[in-house]
């Protein structure tokens, strides 16, 4: 299959593109390389890879590279609430307008597999699992834009949307602003963290399992199409406090406490059911403890927090 991946050198794309190539697909990897990342260099030997430096909002560029592909995976995104708040215009043009443009330019036969976020659930009911039928209630611009474009995607047909849990794990284009990655980094470098809203819960998924999900969708597209799917670890609906307790099992000297004053601007608090995608045969490979162990090793290499989106 010929696949166009936008944002291909980002945190997810840097894991996904090699997996697509290993599976025999031909990949056009488009990225602006705004972080000067070299995360796809190791793939350049592969004749099935073409790398394009450019902006996913460039209509002429997208038209050109859409011509001969079977599938599009639009990863180009200003990811996370803080970054979207810093650049709301860039957030809308990248996270909404650019994806809508792909839908308008593609042929009806070309499929789209799109990563949205389970952040769209916002604040859930205590003790009630959010399913794909749960009304979306985003609490940030990032979440709202993802929810809006998902609605457009599903109405356009011939697509799958993936409501990804909070990602974690090592990637060649590393990010330390993700919660598990951040807390583990603090544990091994600072030895402590002060928590705000420590009881707020969310779901987690390893970046390699996110890549696996895209491959699963490509292989099972006909039976999965035109539906949203939650993607996360069913045994990892954890509060910040519970996450720190998991990290402490591997970093015994890690100290964490909840602040009695102040609050976290991130108000997300929900638990998620991943039963729908599991019924299609998908099963994550990497547990949260395995991911934490991986991060601890990785942070022996990374010594400064230069890997964030803001």
Describe every region a protein language model picked out:
Residues 126, 139, 147, 151-202, ...:
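NAD(P)-dependent short-chain dehydrogenase/reductase
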Residues 1-71:
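N-terminal Rossmann/SDR dinucleotide-binding element
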Residues 39-41, 82-89, 123-127, 172-173:
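Conserved catalytic-core motifs of eukaryotic protein kinase domains, centered on the activation segment
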Residues 6, 30, 72-75, 112-118, ...:
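SDR active-site strand-loop-helix element
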Residues 190-191, 195-310:
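C-terminal substrate-binding subdomain of Rossmann-fold SDR/epimerase-dehydratase oxidoreductases
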Residues 74, 100-139:
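Conserved Rossmann-fold NAD(P)-dependent oxidoreductase catalytic core, especially the SDR/UDP-sugar
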Residues 56-93:
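NAD(P)H-binding glycine-rich loop region in Rossmannoid oxidoreductase-like domains
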């Amino acid at each position: 299959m010929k696949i166009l991946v936008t944002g291909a050198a980002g945190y997810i794309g840097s894991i996904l593109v090699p997996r697509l190539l290993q599976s025999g697909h031909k990949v056009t990897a488009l990225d602006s390389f705004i972080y000067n990342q070299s995360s796809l260099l190791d793939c350049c030997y592969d004749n099935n890879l073409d790398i394009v430096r450019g902006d996913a909002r460039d209509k002429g560029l997208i038209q050109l590279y859409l011509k001969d592909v079977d599938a599009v995976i639009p990863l180009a995104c200003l990811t996370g609430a803080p970054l979207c708040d810093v650049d709301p215009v860039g957030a809308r043009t990248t996270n909404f307008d650019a994806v809508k443009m792909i839908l308008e330019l593609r042929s009806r036969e070309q499929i789209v597999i799109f990563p949205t976020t389970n952040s769209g659930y916002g604040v859930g009911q205590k003790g009630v699992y959010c399913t794909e039928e749960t009304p979306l209630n985003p609490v940030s611009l990032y979440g709202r834009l993802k929810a809006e474009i998902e609605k457009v995607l599903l109405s356009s047909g011939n697509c799958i949307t993936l409501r990804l849990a909070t990602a974690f794990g090592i990637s060649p284009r590393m990010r330390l602003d993700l919660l598990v990655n951040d807390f583990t980094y603090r544990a091994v470098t600072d030895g402590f963290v002060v928590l705000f809203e420590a009881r707020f819960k969310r779901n987690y998924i390893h970046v390699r399992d996110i890549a696996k999900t895209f491959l699963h969708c490509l292989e099972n597209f006909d039976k999965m199409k035109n539906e949203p799917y939650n993607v996360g670890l069913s045994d990892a609906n954890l509060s910040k406090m519970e996450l720190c307790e998991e990290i402490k099992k591997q970093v015994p000297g890690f100290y964490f406490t909840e602040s009695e004053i102040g609050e976290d601007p991130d108000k997300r608090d929900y638990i998620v059911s991943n039963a729908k995608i599991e019924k299609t045969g998908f099963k994550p490979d990497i547990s949260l403890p395995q991911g934490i162990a991986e991060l601890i090793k990785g942070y022996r290499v990374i010594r400064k927090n230069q890997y964030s989106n803001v």
